[in-house]
């Protein structure tokens, strides 16, 4: 939910996460896994977040250096090599970060404890 929290300026987003978003937006490329967008679509339909899927896409399009990483065979192969038990969408998000050699902005304890990818929170 960190992307939604960043877009909505939610107080649950940590200061380190805000700094990571802002730093990457200024000086790099922010990779948004397709699995994150699928999760946003799913939870927004259930009323669990304040931002709709369409609003999320519109906000992403406002930034020049946001790249949506597709869920392709490379991500699936990377996910298949992850031995740690986690929910499928989390595994796909971690696999995307691994494939693109990117840090992951998340507060998910299971992902952090797995130690598979560099996490910012």
Regions found by a protein language model. Give the residues of each.
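Short, structured coil segments at secondary-structure junctions
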Residues: 64, 114-115
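Short glycine/serine/threonine-enriched helix-capping/active-site loop
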Residues: 32-33, 71
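Active-site neighborhoods of divalent-metal-dependent phosphate/nucleic-acid chemistry enzymes
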Residues: 51-52, 63-109
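ABC-type ATPase nucleotide-binding domain
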Residues: 43
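Short, well-structured N-terminal submotif of metal-dependent ribonuclease cores
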Residues: 1-32, 46-59, 100, 109-110, ...
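Active-site-proximal loop/turn and secondary-structure-junction residues that shape catalytic pockets
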Residues: 36
